[in-house]
């Protein structure tokens, strides 16, 4: 398998948010029915635990439909005192920007948000989205290499690529 190091990505994101003063950090994700979403969910829990932050099930929102889950969970997480939310994918974070704008919730003044993937559109949102970057070109090259190995009956292990945090304007103190 080929993938991005979710643990490293969430660790970078939580450290960044802690430097900004955040201590109640939530997660909004899709349902935990895929390997990637499970890995990102566990990476979130690991990062909170590593940095001594509260792990609270009320800080987590899991939902299949993107717009519906942001509409449902953003108010719930804010009522719980969450000041920053990590998202399993950039699309969910972009949906959150729209939802927050509709509710007059200012980003990053009222709520900091971080996505995951670094899709090209994230630098054009208002505000531009802070996100955990997966190097899509490197993922593609490694995927091609892994497929070539399999086709040639060469055994390989998992390939895990480094994550990086792209700091833009959706996070603040």
Feature map (PLM): residue ranges:
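Bacterial carbohydrate/catabolite-sensing allosteric modules
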Residues: 1-173
């Amino acid at each position: 398998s080929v993938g991005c190091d979710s643990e490293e990505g969430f660790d970078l994101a939580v450290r960044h948010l802690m430097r900004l003063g955040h201590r109640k950090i939530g997660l909004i994700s899709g349902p935990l029915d895929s390997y990637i979403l499970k890995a990102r969910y566990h990476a979130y829990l690991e990062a909170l635990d590593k940095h001594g932050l509260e792990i609270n099930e009320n800080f987590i929102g899991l939902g299949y439909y993107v717009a519906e889950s942001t509409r449902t969970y953003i108010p719930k997480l804010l009522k719980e005192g969450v000041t920053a939310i990590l998202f399993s994918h950039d699309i969910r974070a972009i949906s959150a920007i729209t939802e927050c704008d509709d509710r007059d919730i200012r980003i990053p003044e009222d709520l900091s948000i971080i996505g995951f993937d670094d899709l090209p559109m994230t630098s054009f949102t208002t505000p531009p989205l802070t996100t955990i970057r997966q190097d899509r070109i490197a993922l593609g090259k490694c995927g091609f290499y892994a497929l070539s190995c399999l086709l040639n009956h060469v055994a390989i292990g998992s390939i895990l690529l480094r994550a990086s945090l792209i700091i833009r304007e959706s996070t603040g103190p």
